[in-house]
Amino acid sequence: MNKTTKKLILFLLVFNFLFTLFGIKVNDVKAEGLEVLKTHTGSDLTYRGSNEKVYKLSEYNYPTNQLRAVWVTVFASDISGYTSEAQFKQMMNNVLDDMDKMGMNAIVFHVRTHNNALYKSSLNPLASWWSEVDFDVFDPLEWLINACHQRGIEFHAWLNPYRISGDGSNSQYVAEALPAVNPANDENNLIKVGNNVIFDPGIPEVRSFIVDTCMELIENYDVDAIHFDDYFYIDGADDTSTREKYNTENLSIGDFRRKQVDLFIEALSNEIRAYNQENHKAVQLGISPSGIYKNGGYQKAPTYDANGNLTMPTYSNTSGFAHYDDYLYSDTLNWINHEWIDYIMPQCYWAIEHSGANFVELTKWWSWAVRNKKVNFYTGLGIYMGADPSTEGSYKYWKYNENEIQLQLLNAGQYPEFDGACFYKYSSLKQTSSDIVNHAVNLISNDYWAKKIPGAISKYYAPLLDEVAPTMINYDEQTSTISFNEVENSRGYIIYKVPKGTIGRCFW
């Protein structure tokens, strides 16, 4: 083959991310072909309490923008504590290497587990796992964020806003005394149930403090998102004195508590968006609640009001723990409707054949919930259930299908609203004794996620992001080097390479 026929035309498309890693969608068309999803016995899977068949993509559609993430936490032993700069770098480079092999483009990294900080903070005490850190010498979080961005990986800072301890104290998992400004110093700001201690979400000073905590992180570190999971109120909480003081509208217990969490989410959203506007950034606010918002029955199709808010069904076709009511009291649908959050990542951890709350019911409902809204929808994937050898309870349904993750991705992929997925958790993906895990890792590493792509573009910030082409583009054929002028304020660049004669078709 001569040199001419070997030559590849380099088609350079450059996207200005304006301080973000979010790319512009080149092709958002979902595959047309669908087929019925089969149970492990070969019968057609139907939605709970109905004869309606469940469908999935007949073939994976290989999107060009999609969040592909994993949760990583020291609290659940995904990684070990910090002992030295060399140890930390080696440990996290191993994690990032694994993520690269699996085609992942985002890490959800635990930076606040219990009113503590795995970063430099004047508001929260240093976490016990990082007791050996000397920030005057080395800042592990700053290094990690830079290492992620160099690999094209978004960094989502995962915080537990209210949780303080599980040992009855006001300072568990900390390596130093509470700063004087930390409201955990005052027991009147806390709710205690047995040994479990949280901040009282109904106290304005508490809400302001947590907003300040998030903003301190955003202002000092180049994070791409603030991320909360499903910890809000706790089971058995007694906030009688708080309600007596602040429940001026005479709301029910449930309505009062939901309002307190609403006030916090709205305030934080406003602060982040004001910061973004002033600093030309696009830091996101994401929530990963438990999978069920409310329980209900089967409904064929959704209905919406004039503002695009989902009016029916305001519940999924499920039976299980729901976070709207007792005891979490988090009104995530309200946050979606008001577009206070940039993404929702429900923990749709149950298998496709779960009897009470399966994956297919939840992905359908959440896709309905975000429709018409500038809120991205990602699913949390419960690979830990596949990694665990247990066949009891919810775990047994994960053992029905060795290709459970493949079925979940194909089912979710049929919805235009589906923007990606996140595995819980990193250490579970390392459980090579599990055939289910091995199938999932091989699938994403060698096929579905084999080609690394940019994360899903934020629907809220999309209108603010411009596509900017660089100038002075040069290609040195001898050294296969491309050079071009830097585009100011860009996080990164995407380069597409296509064989000669195939311009217009994108190869990854």
Where do the PLM segments sit?
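Active-site clefts of carbohydrate-active enzymes
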Residues: 72-74, 282-319, 347-349, 362-405
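Glycine-rich, aromatic-flanked loop segments that form ligand/cofactor-binding clefts
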Residues: 50-58, 65-69, 104-112, 139-191, ...
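Conserved aromatic anchor
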Residues: 478-490
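Active-site-adjacent "subsite" loops/lids of carbohydrate-active enzymes
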Residues: 64-67, 71-73, 77-89, 156-157, ...
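Recognizes extended acidic, P/S/T-rich segments that occur
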Residues: 492-508
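Substrate-binding cleft of secreted/luminal carbohydrate-active enzymes
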Residues: 329-356, 369-464
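Polysaccharide-binding and catalytic clefts of secreted carbohydrate-active enzymes
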Residues: 112, 183-340, 349-350
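Catalytic domains of carbohydrate-active enzymes, especially glycoside hydrolases
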Residues: 90-117, 220-225, 334, 340-344, ...
